[in-house]
């Protein structure tokens, strides 16, 4: 335990997996944690003594099963292995931590999700600005940015890091700014010193400055990036040659989506368990790199026209040329995770089977490059020029490694025959030598007349001849007895002993030679890190463009016209997610949206609850963002003037942990929108003010619309859904405000939602009808109708609570024969709608009982 305690002391914040023979053991508090997370048995060592210690473990070959569960629970796991062969040493085996796996730092395929990046983030806090960096060590992607707390919060929401680093002294500030929803780890203050982190970066990239990366002036960003490199060293990840550059997240290139918008629009994650995010509709990628890039394209839509148009034009070509798209997709399917494969090469963690997969992936680049070169389209031609098939490396792997190479280097049969003369000779001894043993066995059978004689092997005695007691009198004098059993004797011969040494020695030498040759091949592959990472980026782009083309064809999307204007003109727009969830045979009802900054800047949309106002708002934002991501859109026509910011205030959510009500959260989000407006903003507001009293809500909503319309500097395009019909009056004074309603049709006492957007305001919310549809008791619905009728009759304007007090108590207890009795009117309605010709006797009795209840 002395050795264990010494190693544990170096990693106090991690759960230590301590290799003991064929098991990984945990002790004390670590054992208790492991037992709970993994569901393994907790035992005790030294039970009842002063040195009693909790103990829990699992077989070493089960590491890939248990490690992911530990890491996903938020634990940092230090893996302590035996650094020497126990057979070759006397006393305690030398041990050491070979890897510290954390939620944000792992190469383990069972911890990682192939379709998602696994980001480690670091934040550096300064008074007026924060720096943030993201690293996915499994792919080598390294990003940095800096800005105010709101921008950093947006990036955290967009990139969803698995682990966040910050200075110990800033823990409370971090929680205040970003909450407690992230796995975090606090580092010492000195690690965030600018000079220290700058030096780490230039030493890693072997440069004299960071100007070539465009981050030289980003002091906070540099500090956060350097802190990440320090953390890699601290977690025993020293082989990181695949981290070849650090990229600046260029805020000016991408549409601003605050964290509320990313959440509300469900771009990559659904809010509800059964929900479907947009990415599930658009993701038809065939490679892991493509799946990861597509997510970035959706959370970082472009603002610049040229790259948007290049994507759209390429998607159009792929839509029209189905043969090209089909062929490209077929070539993409066999390609493995080039980013993570070459990252494992750099980290010296790649296995033989993965090297074969790398070779197969590189081989697919040749036909892809040839296909692209045949196209008369500059984007595809440019991509073709950037592909480097690394044919020499692919050939080296092909000629050296067996196609069915095993996972582990010590399993043998990695290297092809003919690559090494000594290896071939040893294999002849090791593998054909066993045939020679059978020849010895047959010769001795014939020599002795012992028909049951056989040659066997065990680790204690090696190869031996076994003779049953029945025939032991026939044993020749030159045989040497090694073991006596109950019913048999075991012998060896000089010839058998010599050949055994040759066979066993050959197998050991084979492993040594194969491992050395494989390690040399891996070192050779390291020189291809940059071109293979470049290939991965090209393949990912091709994959995403093919994915957009597939979605466009499958879902009947149109190519949007994206231009430098203030216009948004969508004809027959549809919600890309909802239309795919409708029952078979039911079609999505499309709607038109027109916004500009001269005639129709603000659309006030009224209509009943459940009519589809919220879906219309979200659908508009999704169409705009899809267009600026380079995708076709669900509409018959769409002209999109580029937006630079998209704001949404939809849905209700409390933040009770911070003592904030639904209304307070709503006001915070609305204030954030109004304080960050621009002339190219798209603003979506749904039911603002519903969390407070009616007149407070109307007043706030009214003032917000006025503010958006009369802003001295900007005219943000706005969709404003509300159930406050009083807002329809705004069009009288605000010329760029227009009223629309989502229409309904009344049939008796039922409401049919038409889900069609029409000009003009609506005067009814039909809330009571919705309550009836939800299954509210009939008596309650009748009472609600009575109260509403009274309020409408009295024309409630002021003293709302006083008027409510004046509403008479339920008149259901009055005389059944009172002519003005509302209950009697309700009974007449029920009887009118009842078809006695199709009622069963039981149904009739139930209906009679319902009527009886109304007059009690």
Swiss-Prot record:
Chain positions recorded as ATP binding sites: 607-614
Keywords from the named record: ATP-binding, DNA damage, DNA repair, DNA-binding, Nucleotide-binding
Cited function: This protein is involved in the repair of mismatches in DNA. It is possible that it carries out the mismatch recognition step. This protein has a weak ATPase activity.
Any one Gene Ontology molecular-function term assigned to this protein's record: ATP-dependent DNA damage sensor activity
One Pfam family, short name: MutS_V
UniProt keyword Glycosyltransferase present: no
A biological process from GO: mismatch repair
Family listed: Belongs to the DNA mismatch repair MutS family.
Organism field: Cytophaga hutchinsonii (strain ATCC 33406 / DSM 1761 / CIP 103989 / NBRC 15051 / NCIMB 9469 / D465)
InterPro entries on file: DNA_mismatch_repair_MutS (IPR005748), DNA_mismatch_repair_MutS-lik_N (IPR007695), DNA_mismatch_repair_MutS/MSH (IPR017261), DNA_mismatch_repair_MutS_C (IPR000432), DNA_mismatch_repair_MutS_clamp (IPR007861), DNA_mismatch_repair_MutS_core (IPR007696), DNA_mismatch_repair_MutS_N (IPR016151), DNA_mismatch_repair_MutS_sf (IPR036187)
GO cellular component, one term: cytosol
Designated name of the protein: DNA mismatch repair protein MutS
HAMAP family for this protein: MutS
Gene3D superfamilies: 1.10.1420.10, DNA repair protein MutS, domain I, MutS, connector domain, P-loop containing nucleotide triphosphate hydrolases
Classification via NCBIfam families: mutS1, PRK05399.1
